[in-house]
Regions:
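Catalytic donor nucleotide-activated moiety binding site of glycosyltransferases and closely related
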Residues: 1-8, 20-68
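Short low-complexity, flexible loop/linker segments enriched in glycine and/or proline
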Residues: 54-58, 114-119
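N-terminal core-binding DNA-recognition domain of tyrosine site-specific recombinases/integrases
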Residues: 13-21
C-alpha cells in the first residue's frame, strides 16, 4: 500500500507475495490486550481494519494524527514490535527494540540482518504435488532467495500465510522471551 501510494509510476505487484490481511492478527491483538499491553498499529498507509473496541488498542495507521515522524517516535519507545517484514520493521531494530516478525518471506529474510529474536516465515506449497515444502526442499529449489511474485509462479509454488493460531502461539512465545529477559535484568540489578 505504501509503495503503491507514494511511488505510483511503478507497479509494485512483484511484492504481493509478502502481503497478508490484518484480520489474521485479531486473536493476537486480543491476547496482547488480555496481557495488559497497549497495542498500536503503526504505518502511514494500511489496508483493512480490525474490529476491536478496546482502549488498549489504537489503529494509529488509520487515524487523522499519523505521520512518518510519529511512526519513528512510537517505534523508538515501544516495548516490542510484532508484525510483518515490511520496511517499517527495520525501525525498531535500529532503536534496538525487540522485534518479532510474522509471515516472513522469503526465508532468506530471517537471516538478512542481525537478529536476536525469532521470526516465523510463510510456508511454501508446491502447486504440482499440493505438498508443503520442508526447509531443505526450499533450499534445494532455490526458494530462499526468491523475491518476486512472478518468480514464485514460475517455480510453481505459492506462499501460505501463517494462520491466526500460529501467529497467536508466536505471540505467546514472544511475551515469554520478553518476560525472561526482564527477569534476567531484574536479577542482575538486585
Amino acid at each position: 500500500t505504501y509503495l503503491n501510494n507514494f511511488l505510483r509510476d511503478k507497479s509494485w505487484e512483484y511484492h504481493d507475495y509478502r502481503n497478508f490481511p490484518i484480520k489474521d492478527l485479531k486473536k493476537t491483538v486480543n491476547y496482547f490486550i488480555e496481557k495488559n499491553y497497549f497495542v498500536i498499529r503503526v504505518g502511514s498507509l494500511s489496508e483493512g481494519k480490525l474490529n476491536i473496541s478496546n482502549n488498549r488498542y489504537f489503529d494509529y495507521s488509520n487515524s487523522d494524527i499519523k505521520s512518518d515522524f510519529m511512526d519513528c517516535f512510537l517505534l523508538s519507545k515501544c516495548e516490542m514490535f510484532f508484525g510483518g517484514s515490511s520496511g517499517i520493521c527495520l525501525l525498531p531494530a535500529s532503536f534496538r527494540k525487540p522485534y518479532f516478525l510474522i509471515n516472513n518471506c522469503p526465508l532468506e529474510g530471517i537471516f538478512s540482518i542481525k537478529r536476536n529474536y525469532p521470526a516465523i516465515f510463510k510456508r511454501i506449497k508446491n502447486l504440482k504435488t499440493n505438498k508443503i515444502l520442508s526447509i531443505k526442499e526450499m533450499i534445494d529449489r532455490d526458494l530462499c532467495n526468491t523475491y518476486t511474485s512472478e518468480e514464485y509462479k514460475i517455480k510453481n509454488v505459492i506462499n501460505l500465510n501463517n494462520s491466526e493460531q500460529e501467529i497467536k502461539e508466536f505471540a505467546i512465545e514472544a511475551l515469554n522471551i520478553l518476560e525472561c529477559q526482564k527477569k534476567n535484568r531484574d536479577d542482575v540489578y538486585e
